[in-house]
Amino acid sequence: MRRHRAYLTGLDAVLGDGDHGDNMAIGFRAVSEVIEDLPPDATPGVVIRAAGHRLVAAVGGASGPLYGTAFIAAGHVAGDARMVGVETLASMLDSAATALARRGRCAVGDKTILDALRPAADAFAAAATKGSPLQGCVAVAVTAARDGMLGTRPLIARRGLALRMGTRSIGHLDPGAVSCYLL
């Protein structure tokens, strides 16, 4: 996220309050620190939940609670398993998208993070159902996230600070959808 800090901040300066890049960089630096403090044998669920709690605590604005909630939900699905398979990863992504939508009271088409996350989760799950290997599931999820992110450009924002802009939000990518794609 540090590499994309200026880009995300520039996007958010148009639609929001111009802090999304800073918040994401701060948040994921804090996530790195909390992960370093975990025991080496921490399960994926523990790591992901810890990351989510740190995002909620460290990141201002809406993105910290939204991303944090998504990570925490995904971590709960992972549970205490030492390894997670493709099917569990699909459930984790679905749970993350559902929790984020509930927390943000948003839907696909509202010009939010969810416009990238939900299509990615659905594409990953569809590929997993067809028996695709992890790499194939990730590839279709990344493509779906990219398409969802790019699809925010013609939308009118219906959530967040960009809501104030009304039709002036058309023609701009949603910073949250962009950061979701980058993740």
PLM region descriptions:
Residues 1-183:
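N-terminal loops that bind phosphate or other acidic moieties
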